[in-house]
Every structure is written in C-alpha cells, then in structure tokens.
Swiss-Prot record:
Gene3D superfamilies: (Glycosyl)asparaginase
Purpose of the protein: Cleaves the GlcNAc-Asn bond which joins oligosaccharides to the peptide of asparagine-linked glycoproteins.
Keywords: Autocatalytic cleavage, Disulfide bond, Hydrolase, Protease, Signal
Organism: Drosophila yakuba
Name of this protein: Putative N(4)-(beta-N-acetylglucosaminyl)-L-asparaginase GE19290
One BP term from GO: proteolysis
Gene Ontology MF: a single term: peptidase activity
GO cellular component terms, A-Z: lysosome
Reaction(s) catalysed (UniProt annotation): N(4)-(beta-N-acetyl-D-glucosaminyl)-L-asparagine + H2O = N-acetyl-beta-D-glucosaminylamine + L-aspartate + H(+)
UniProt similarity note: Belongs to the Ntn-hydrolase family.
Paired cysteines (S-S): C100-C105, C199-C215, C357-C384
C-alpha cells in the first residue's frame, strides 16, 4: 500500500513539474499588444504594437482633452521630475491645467472668456486624488484667475469638497490669491455683441417675454404639459467646442497613483450662478487608484445629470476596457439626448486608454507617455458621428 501511494505521489509531482515547465515556455510575458483592447486607429499606437513594448512602458502618463499641447507638455515635464513620476501626479495636473488658464485655451478656460449674461467671467475647477478619494473644487469663482490652484487649496487646507461664488473668492484671498478682474476687452466685446443681437442665443425657456427675441428681464410663463417637450427642444442652446469647453487632465505614475483635474470658464452667456459638470466629482472627472480615471468635456448641463466619468470608471472596475467604458458611459446620455455634444477619455491604472465622442466631427486629445513613437507627447484624434445613436471609439 505504501509503495502504491509513493508511486501515485511521484506521478503527480512529475505531472505538476511538466505542466509548470510547459507554462513557462508557452506563456509569454504580457506585451503592449496583449495589454491593449480594441482596434488601434492611430499610427503611433500601431508602431508601439509592432515594437512589442511591454505594458510597463505605458507609465507614467499624462492625458488631457483637446489639443492643449502646452498644458500637456508642462504636466509631463513636471511628472518626469521624479523617477516614474512618483509623488508628482498632483503637481502635474494642477500646473498643467493652470497653464491652460494662463493661456486662455480656446477662450473656454481661464479669464477673459465665456462671459455670462451680465458680462462677467467666472471659473470652475476641480482636483481629485485617486489614492484618498479626496476632492477640492471651486465653482462660480469670481475675480480670481488661478481656479485650479484654489481648488487644490480646498483639497489640502479644508475638510470640504467644494466652495462656491464670493465665499470661494474670500477663501482664495485668505490663502494668498489676489483679486483682479477676469474681464478682458475681448470678453467685453463678446458680451456687447451678444446684447446687441437681442441676447441670442441664451439658456432661458418657458418665460416671457419670448427669450428668442428679447433680453428680458423674464418672468415664468405657464406651459401646458403637452407642450413641454416641444418648448424644450425649441429653446435648446446649440453647444459647440468654441462656446462650451473644458480641460480635463489625468496623470498617473509608475505605481498607478492617479490625480485628475478640470478647469473651465463654463458656458458662454450662461445665466449668472450656473455651474456645469467640470467641478462635480464623477461628472467632470473621477479617479480611483484601484481602477483608473476618466475626464469629460462637452455640454455640462446634460453631462452632470449622468456622472459620465464615474460611470466610465465603474465600467472599468467591472472589467470593461477603457474604450468600451467610455462608449458605454456616453450611450447612457445619448439615449435621452440625441442632440447632445460631448467626449470622454478613460484610462485604467495600467495606462491603457480609450476615448469616445458624440455630436462633433472629431475629438482631439493629448497624450504623453513612454509609448510614443516619435517622442513622448503626441496628438490623438477620434472621429465622431453626430446626430445618430452611434459613437466612434478609439482604444489603446
């Protein structure tokens, strides 16, 4: 009996050793090609695949919405100040978004853009730490140019998540930021032209006098329930890149520490007091070191109702690749708003990323990482299909 037992144990041991040896010879180490999901649509990524780079070469990374190159380059330079970007992701995101504020990117970020109905520019911004899940945000910030840096002070020096309006400005003053006008000759001319054209377009509905031909002041107009959908469609403000935009940025180091941030001056000719999606956690941006991060841009009044950045991160948590997560998140919105315009970038903790967009011709975004073919920083573009229940995606 003992001899029989020893023989069985010997056979099991031999089989285990053989299988282990076979696995070592037939299971290659993960490469960039096996790490990516979906079909590549850019030359840079195709070259990276052919080069057979390992997944570890995807990090560190900086990625942001739109072709805001200077912001990305600065964030990448800051991220690279330490090996692998360690302890620099927050600095990278804050300084990258701050660069866009100073450059007044597309006149939709920073001072001197998107005046509201009274001709004033106000700012929204947010920073989120994917390790602690802490957020610092400001909304409707007045007379302070450094919105993203004030948001950082909210994160680091208060137990709150968001400060708004004049009180946020007073907090900024207490933290050492100087008050100054955010109005420029360009933004003043923009507002004067708008008022000369009977305040068209605007964001009012179900009021009198008719907001399509008048500047107001307005009063509520009773609307029969049967006409509500008709009036909503008729009065919708056409959202486009030049009147409604955000920089959303994500930075990840080699240990998958993540920060995400946003900055914007909101919708042009907005009703004073309006806040969009950018400073709202889960809407404008969301980050979780266990999974990844996402940033959004587009029609913030619609997007904040669906928390698309949170949806994308949770889809990745459930196992979806970044591109599929971004698409799924946008489809949730599109089912309810066929005229919606927006885009989303999703990145997992390993540096794999995807983008989806709707309602535009195309959506450009900037990426800096070791996986670049002709250097770390490159512009990626995804084509969008507008006016149909369909989304083009690009995944890497």
């Amino acid at each position: 009996m003992k001899r029989h037992l020893k023989a069985c144990l010997w056979v099991l041991c031999f089989a285990s050793t053989a299988l282990s040896s076979l696995a070592d010879t037939t299971s290659p180490k993960p490469t960039l090609a096996s790490a990516f999901s979906g079909k590549s649509k850019t030359t840079a990524v195709s070259t990276a695949l052919k080069a057979n780079k390992t997944a570890s070469e995807l990090l560190p990374m900086v990625i942001n919405t739109w072709n805001f190159t200077a912001a990305n380059v600065l964030a990448w330079r800051i991220l690279k100040q330490s090996k692998g970007g360690l302890r620099q992701t927050r600095n990278a995101v804050v300084e990258g978004c701050s660069k866009c504020e100073k450059l007044q990117c597309d006149r939709t970020v920073g001072y001197g853009g998107s005046p509201d109905e009274l001709g004033e520019t106000t700012l929204d911004a947010m920073v989120m730490d994917g390790a602690t899940m802490e957020v610092g945000a400001v909304a409707g910030l007045r007379r302070i140019k450094d919105a993203i840096k004030v948001a950082r002070h909210v994160l680091e020096h208060t137990q709150h998540t968001m400060l708004v309006g004049d009180a946020a400005s007073a907090f900024a003053n207490a933290m050492g930021f100087e008050s100054e006008s955010l109005v420029t000759p360009e933004s003043k001319d923009m507002w004067l032209q708008w008022t000369a054209e009977n305040c068209q377009p605007n964001f009012w509905k179900n009021v009198h006098p008719d907001p399509k031909v008048s500047c107001g002041p307005y009063k509520p107009r009773p609307t029969p329930l049967t006409r509500w959908k008709e009036d909503r469609a008729r009065n919708e403000y056409e959202i486009g890149r030049k009147n409604h935009d955000t920089i959303g940025m994500i930075a990840i180091d080699v240990e998958s520490n993540i920060h995400a941030g946003t900055s914007t001056n909101g919708a042009r000719h907005k009703i004073p007091g309006r806040v969009g999606d950018s400073p709202i956690p889960g809407a404008g941006a969301y980050a979780d070191n266990e999974v990844g991060a996402a940033v959004a841009t587009g029609d913030g009044d619609v997007m904040m109702r669906f928390l698309p950045s949170l949806l994308a991160v949770e889809a990745m948590r459930a196992g979806k690749p970044p591109a599929d997560a971004a698409e799924e998140s946008l489809r949730r919105i599109i089912r309810h708003h066929k005229d919606f315009m927006g885009a989303l970038i999703a990145v997992d903790r390993l540096g794999r990323y995807g983008a989806a967009c709707y309602g535009l011709d195309e959506f450009p975004f900037m990426v800096s990482s070791p996986a670049g073919r002709d250097g770390p920083t490159r512009l990626e573009t995804v084509k969008c299909i507008a006016g149909q229940d369909k989304v083009n995606i690009v995944s890497f």
